[in-house]
Amino acid sequence: MLAGVLTALALIPEVISFSVIAGVDPQVSLIASVVLCLAMSIFGGRPAMVTAAAGSVALVIGPMVHQHGVGYILPAVILAGIIQILFGLCGMARLMRFIPPAVMTGFVNALGILIFFAQVPHFWSRQPLIVGLFVLTLLIILWAPRVIKAIPAPLIAIVALTLYTATTGQLLPTVGDEGSMSGGLPGFTALTVPLNLTTLQIIWPCALSIAFVGLMESLLTAKLVDDLTHTPSNK
């Protein structure tokens, strides 16, 4: 239970930052992560697995959202899921052994670089305090695990610096500025775009990218967990 609570708390700042990259309300990524965690706990390839909104997928979805709107996310994700099911039926996981380790390393590092540059516009500011908080957050994340191992370092940084800005009365941009955080569960939203060839032309490049990136990340993570636990995952 403790592991589940700590994981949930660690995911909150992560998925909120990814929602900013994707150009959607933070509440959207939070609810999506809840659904993903529940689905993973039931249908996951191994016990005690969790998942949530991924920065790599946010990078793929972001350009489509900015160009065409949020309404195209749902059909794009549905199409990506269908593509991944087809990949699974075709035994795509078995082909992973033919990919050189250098390609895997380059893939992961490239995603990290893209996520970094996607955050730069939010970091670049004329307010020196924002730059200082950014640097202090990095230092806490790097050094906190050496002292406190029971609480995730990103959570420590967010709580500590949020309390600092709130108690000192600093007027800074907040997550609430990116979208509404009403605190209630949203209702089901039907498709807001027509299901026709025009929509398919818009979503299929994004859906294919989501499918490939999601598959690569999942298989890479599964391999890493297999190596750490010395047990096989159901790929």
Language model features with spans:
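Transmembrane helical cores of multi-pass ion-transport proteins
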Residues: M1-K235
